[in-house]
Each structure stands twice: as structure tokens, then as C-alpha cells.
Amino acid sequence: MKIWVDADACPKVIRETLIRAAERTGVECTFVANHLIPLPKRDNIRALQVSSGFDIADNEIVRRTEAGDLVITADIPLADEVISKGGLALNPRGELYTKETIKARLNIRDFMDTMRASGIQTGGPAALSQTERREFANHLDRILAKRTG
């Protein structure tokens, strides 16, 4: 099992949680972004810098993900592709996407895109709460315990 992180929009606190988990378990964790991500020097923690452009990082993550890998992303279409390849997709807010929930999330995303395109202001996401951070860490620990223990 490998962890792939859609790192362009990954909150720093989540990145730090992932680094600690990778250090603790030895699982390979790769942060994919179109800019340099500061990371500690560890054999199992890597940065993969891709060129800037629409979905470049997402496409690279999909290309490299294998069944059983974990992808950390808030990007619903990316999560859908990962799940269809047999991977796991975990949102930085602690939501584990599943085959059962991802289609509904895609529909909501498309609806919100339509609203924004019609000029309705939908606002951005709220700041990451302590509960969401804890939920993320708990899901991550459960996944890693199943896969590495």
C-alpha cells in the first residue's frame, strides 16, 4: 500500500499528520503538487512535482495509483477515479469516499458548479475544524492498521 496526496490544496495540518503516520508505519507517502512541498528527508516520504495545468497532478495520481493504495484528496472526480481503480480515497476533512457515496458527491459537486456558473455565490469551504482533523487522523489510523498491521 502506498499513500498518494493531492498536495496542491492539502492543508498543512493534514500534511503533518500524514508525515507522522508515514514515519510511524514506514508506508510510502508521495505528495504530488505543481509546486515544491517542504518535506522531511525520509526514504518513504517523497515529493513529486508536476507541471502546472488543469488536472495535471490529478492525472499523475490516477496513473500511478494501484488497487489498495490510499489517495488523500478533496477532489471528487479524482476520488471517483481512484475508487474505480480499487484504491481508497480519503478527504482531508475525514470523509472516506466509497463506491456507495461517491456518485452522490459527484452529483452535489455538479449541482454546485451549475449554481456558480449561473452567478450564484456558493462560498468556499469553512476552515478545517478540530473534529475534522481528528476524524481524518482516526480514519487514516484505521486504514493503516488494516493494511500494515
UniProtKB/Swiss-Prot annotation:
Q: Which Pfam families match?
A: DUF188
State the source organism's domain of life. Answer: Bacteria
Record's family? Answer: Belongs to the UPF0178 family.
Cross-referenced HAMAP family? UPF0178 (MF_00489)
- UniProt-recorded name of the protein: UPF0178 protein VC_0881
For this protein's source organism, the top of the classification is: Bacteria, Pseudomonadati, Pseudomonadota, Gammaproteobacteria, Vibrionales
